[in-house]
């Protein structure tokens, strides 16, 4: 007479394909005396499905970082002529949404702020207020010479000489104005930076 373990092994092998797990010899059904799940078509089907397939194992931080890089929502903050190129990057020719980079009108739903254009002293408090309303982790792309360091209006009394005096900047995109390709490259650099740092809180 064969043991319950042997019966379970025979039942699994007759269902087709090798088993993934060893027979559960210690957990027996008191009514039948056989291992729990032996002969159950559901367990046999699951066992068969998992027999030739692998599993994807990842750390939680890596999974969150991967998901974040593919679903960045950007807050539009167009201040001058650079905003035209910022709008161009979401048009069909470049289609930045294929990288998971979609625009949002609310700072409370945004991960990234693109400061595009000349930041004046009167606009600086509004920029900081919008930045403070964004949830953590939040990122800022400075687009254009005026946002980077004042640009053409560097010596003007009314212009902030670089928006990094108001908010921390993650990526600088140079140009006057930068092309849509340059902004797209800056977005890809930001995604690479997020993958490299991989922190949930900043």
UniProtKB/Swiss-Prot annotation:
Residues at which [4Fe-4S] cluster binds: 81-82, 146, 176
Cofactor binding note: Binds 1 [4Fe-4S] cluster.
Major enzyme class: translocase
UniProt lineage: Bacteria, Pseudomonadati, Pseudomonadota, Alphaproteobacteria, Hyphomicrobiales
Organism: Nitrobacter hamburgensis (strain DSM 10229 / NCIMB 13809 / X14)
Record InterPro entries: NADH_UbQ_OxRdtase-like_20kDa (IPR006137), NADH_UQ_OxRdtase_20Kd_su (IPR006138)
Family statement: Belongs to the complex I 20 kDa subunit family.
Ranges of Polar residues composition bias in the record: 1-13
Bilayer topology term: Peripheral membrane protein
EC number: 7.1.1.-
Cystine residue pairs: none
BP GO terms, sorted: aerobic respiration; electron transport coupled proton transport
Subcellular localization: Cell inner membrane
Protein name: NADH-quinone oxidoreductase subunit B
Source organism superkingdom: Bacteria
Biological function: NDH-1 shuttles electrons from NADH, via FMN and iron-sulfur (Fe-S) centers, to quinones in the respiratory chain. The immediate electron acceptor for the enzyme in this species is believed to be ubiquinone. Couples the redox reaction to proton translocation (for every two electrons transferred, four hydrogen ions are translocated across the cytoplasmic membrane), and thus conserves the redox energy in a proton gradient.
One GO CC annotation: plasma membrane
Record keywords: 4Fe-4S, Cell inner membrane, Cell membrane, Iron, Iron-sulfur, Membrane, Metal-binding, NAD, Quinone, Translocase, Transport, Ubiquinone
NCBIfam families given in the database record: nuoB_fam, PRK06411.1
